[in-house]
Design a protein with these regions (language model features):
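Conserved donor-binding/catalytic core segment of Leloir-type glycosyltransferases
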Residues: 168, 210-228, 234-238, 249-257
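Carbohydrate-associated surface elements
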Residues: 173, 195
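Nucleotide-activated donor-binding/catalytic signature segment of Leloir-type glycosyltransferases, i.e.
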Residues: 262-310
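Short alpha-helical donor nucleotide-sugar binding micro-motif in glycosyltransferases
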Residues: 318-323
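Aromatic "clamp/platform" in nucleotide-sugar-dependent glycosyltransferases that forms part
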Residues: 331
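Short hydrophobic beta-strand element within catalytic cores of glycosyltransferases
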Residues: 348-351
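Conserved acidic donor-binding segment of nucleotide-sugar-dependent glycosyltransferases
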Residues: 363-364, 368-375, 384-389
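A short, well-ordered alpha-helix in the C-terminal region of glycosyltransferases
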Residues: 377, 384, 391-406, 415-418
Length: 428
């Protein structure tokens, strides 16, 4: 079986160093597939002067194609969209057929010579018909890590799904939304959870749970963006600091908000669409969220909050190992990578009860849930854990066990192989 993974047309896709979650996912899965005698993997990515157009690494062949005029065309379309200020548009620029059309057409044409069985694309449903047009015998897998299929124009998505043989989502939360909206395609939808690296237990720094002298450290890992609920976390910090004056909060992640069009503009959830107040309107959408967060901090809290910024993924593990609790206050979350990363390192989690995170955390066993946007409840659950080291340790151990059972890269690869085999063996 030969699988072609078609990367989203941005990011590095460096085989020697992965940064984004999809780059990590692709590398971890493709490299494991290549360990099977009857599997080969190709990864398509955008052309980059730093890397050769074709190279191999750990059995994976990387093939890079030019974007041509794609980026100029997309910038012009985005500018036009923002000038017109479409309210609640269900087919924004990123979901249009022309979006990165040169990229996907080049991939589709190259695929004709690669003798692949499966083309595995991510999130951009408009790529599926292009692949099928030039490769009618190729099976197309659409991997969704967001809610776009249930948020974008229903008729447009329905037509595109005709070119998709299997829809794989990162959580049952996403899968069920797609099945409810498109019942005719329900049997083509399934869930394959994300995976995580699980360090040796000797590397997880469990002695922190026995120390009463060290300052307690809270950790947030993710984009500093309105939908991640960082404003609720900082509001909760006032009560947390009052109860535990020695606490520190590390906020690790890029301080650039998610594009307004990608989520807030198309969401049917009033809590999420209400985040539009954090975005400016007009031709240029100034990102004011990070500045507003820093301005909201009172002095007694400000010196307890550390904005670390973006760090290489390999270095994030160090933050987990020196943390006591992970907090994820997201208002929208398809899965919750930070939860399984923290749990893999034996750390308890305090998370909002939203999206795919409800399938990861077991309330009262591996951490605590709180209702999204409830800063008081967030503070209460966090303080409970901070004041109880035995509870932190037992929940951390339970979380690590849960990750070992459900969220290993080996599980991901085996689940995918099962789906691949099913559609390849099925009759058209």
């Amino acid at each position: 079986m030969k699988i072609a993974f078609i990367s989203q047309p941005f990011g590095d896709m460096n085989p020697h160093h992965q940064s984004s979650s999809l780059e990590i996912w692709t590398y971890e899965v493709a490299s494991r597939l290549c360990n099977y005698d009857d599997c080969d993997a190709i990864v398509y990515a955008r052309e980059d002067d730093r890397y050769p157009k074709i190279e191999e690494h750990k059995g994976i062949q990387y093939r890079r194609v030019s974007l041509g005029l794609d980026e100029k065309t997309n910038r012009l379309a985005n500018t036009t969209e923002r000038i017109l200020s479409y309210p609640r548009q269900k087919l924004p620029v990123f979901a249009q057929q022309f979006y990165y059309q040169n990229y996907i057409k080049q991939v589709a044409l190259d695929l004709r010579d690669q003798d692949c069985d499966i083309a595995h694309i991510f999130n951009f449903s408009q790529f599926a018909p292009v692949i099928k047009e030039h490769n009618s015998n190729l099976k197309v897998v659409l991997n969704m890590t967001c809610e776009w299929l249930s948020q974008l124009d229903e008729n447009v998505i329905k037509r595109r799904l005709q070119s998709v043989d299997q829809v794989i989502s990162c959580s049952n939360y996403i899968t069920h939304k797609i099945q409810q909206r498109f019942p005719a395609y329900a049997d083509r939808c399934t869930t394959v959870y994300n995976g995580v690296y699980i360090p040796d237990s000797n590397s997880t720094n469990e002695e922190r749970f026995q120390s009463e002298e060290e300052n307690k450290r809270l950790l947030f890992v993710g984009r500093v963006s309105p939908e991640k609920g960082v404003h609720d976390l900082l509001q909760a910090m006032h009560k947390i600091v009052e109860a535990c004056p020695d606490v520190q909060l590390d906020i690790v992640g890029p301080t650039i908000s998610l594009a307004y069009e990608y989520l807030v503009m198309i969401s049917d959830d009033p809590t999420v669409s209400g985040l539009s107040s954090f975005y400016t309107k007009g031709l240029v959408r100034h990102d004011t969220y990070f500045k507003s967060l820093k301005a909201s901090l009172e002095p007694d809290v400000a010196n307890r909050v550390n904005f670390i910024g973006q760090v290489p993924h390999a270095d994030i593990m160090c933050f987990y190992q020196h943390a006591d609790i992970l907090i994820n206050p997201s208002l929208s979350e398809s899965f919750g990578i930070s939860l399984i990363e923290a749990m893999a390192n034996g750390r308890p989690v305090v998370a909002s009860r939203v999206g795919g995170m409800q399938e990861i955390l077991i309330n009262g066993e591996t951490g605590f849930f709180f209702e999204p946007g409830d800063a008081d409840a967030l503070a209460e659950k966090t303080i409970t854990l901070l004041k109880n080291p035995d509870m932190r340790k037992s929940m951390g151990m339970a979380g690590r066990q849960r990750v070992q059972e459900l969220f290993t890269w080996e599980n991901v690869t085996q689940d995918l192989l099962l789906q691949y085999s099913r559609i390849v063996d099925s009759e058209d």
